Curated annotation (Swiss-Prot):
Belongs to the nucleoside phosphorylase PpnP family. Keywords: Glycosyltransferase, Transferase. Coiled coil: none annotated. This is Pyrimidine/purine nucleoside phosphorylase. GO terms for molecular function: guanosine phosphorylase activity; purine-nucleoside phosphorylase activity; thymidine phosphorylase activity; uridine phosphorylase activity. InterPro entries: Ppnp (IPR009664), RmlC-like_jellyroll (IPR014710), RmlC_Cupin_sf (IPR011051). The lineage of its organism: Bacteria, Bacillati, Bacillota, Clostridia, Peptostreptococcales. PANTHER family: PYRIMIDINE/PURINE NUCLEOSIDE PHOSPHORYLASE, PYRIMIDINE_PURINE NUCLEOSIDE PHOSPHORYLASE. It is an enzyme of class 2 (transferase). Catalyzes the phosphorolysis of diverse nucleosides, yielding D-ribose 1-phosphate and the respective free bases. Can use uridine, adenosine, guanosine, cytidine, thymidine, inosine and xanthosine as substrates. Also catalyzes the reverse reactions. One of its GO terms (cellular component) is cytosol. It catalyses: a purine D-ribonucleoside + phosphate = a purine nucleobase + alpha-D-ribose 1-phosphate; adenosine + phosphate = alpha-D-ribose 1-phosphate + adenine; cytidine + phosphate = cytosine + alpha-D-ribose 1-phosphate; guanosine + phosphate = alpha-D-ribose 1-phosphate + guanine. It comes from Clostridioides difficile (strain 630).
Length: 105
């Protein structure tokens, strides 16, 4: 899906890592929450509360998911799942445009 219709958008951005990662929350008509964001090149660690699906819209990054000892490269058009109550490491190689979907328990 390349666009979302009839959404509620939160005006204030989520800003992390001194502005190198930012996102905005959108809420779909069915209550589903997503964030649309950008990441600048760098290395980051994020923690999750809910399960997340990260969809790569542009760029590439290396991802080390929970339980793995190795980084895997994800590029435009790919996605990966992150379990709830965990953390994951990123090595962003170029500007990344992403959509994160949150899966409620």
């Amino acid at each position: 899906m390349s666009e979302f219709k009839n959404v509620t958008a939160v005006k204030k951005a989520n800003v992390y890592f001194d502005g190198k990662v930012s996102s905005r929350v959108i809420i779909l008509p069915n209550g589903e929450r997503k964030t649309l964001g950008l990441m600048l090149p760098g290395e980051y660690t994020f923690s999750t509360r809910e399960e997340e699906i990260m969809e790569m819209l542009a760029g590439s990054m290396d991802v080390k998911l929970p339980g793995s000892n190795e980084f895997v490269t994800y590029k435009e058009g790919q996605k990966f799942n992150v379990p709830s109550d965990s953390s994951f490491d990123l090595k962003v190689n170029e500007v990344v445009d992403y959509c994160c979907s949150y899966i409620a328990d």
